[in-house]
Amino acid sequence: SVLNAGDNEVTRIDLLMAGGRWQQKQPLQALFTNRMLREGTRRYDAAQIAEKLDYYGAWLELSSASEYAYVTLYSLNKYLPQTLDVLESIVKEPVFPEKELGVIVDNNIQQFLVNSSKVDFLAHRGLVKALYGGQHPGGRLVQEEDYRRITPAVLREFYDRYYHSNNCSIYLSGKVTGDCIHRIESLFGCEAFGTDFRKPEKTEFHPVTTSGKRIFIDVRTPCKVPSVWACFPWTVIIRTT
């Protein structure tokens, strides 16, 4: 799809892959698969990717949601040949390097442990579990050991299943030129890419909301009780131990 609007010579390119938390086989698989795309490909390592995008004034966003993964590039039109080369490599040939993955996982574990001492974080986890139930992707809470189960092979499995040409939609917006469309079609539309060309399976989950009206959450450090949950039909009671 193309939305041609704006006066600045900038184009936004969005690639959507149908595959997110609802399709993953284990917690964090979809998130880290998407996150690691920029950490190394067959042609470029993480430093080269960052350097090239910075040099050409481009910006790359990676995100993963419940049913979709997103790869978004903002680029000046005059540098599209260079920035699209990086984008193509990121999407088609990531290598999920073990060293870089280990560093990112360790950093995320540390952040998880820090957040686990914060009341707002714990209260949010308690509320989503009460709303959706522990077997629903929205209520299945990530634990520390889930981070340690993330490996390059786990990410490669998810990538091979969902990151392919038969499961990719592309949206262009900004100052979209004919040259831009031609380049996108040449890179992503002329030849199939990926290994598994099946469409994602249709998965349905039904929330199992708790019948209780109070949620008790034990924390091991003194803290203040937040007041931001008044819109929910439960009372969150924080018990410090």
Regions inferred by a protein language model and the residue ranges of each:
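Charge-rich, well-structured scaffold segments of protease-associated domains
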Residues: Q48-K199
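His/Glu-rich zincin catalytic helix
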Residues: S1-E51, R156-T241
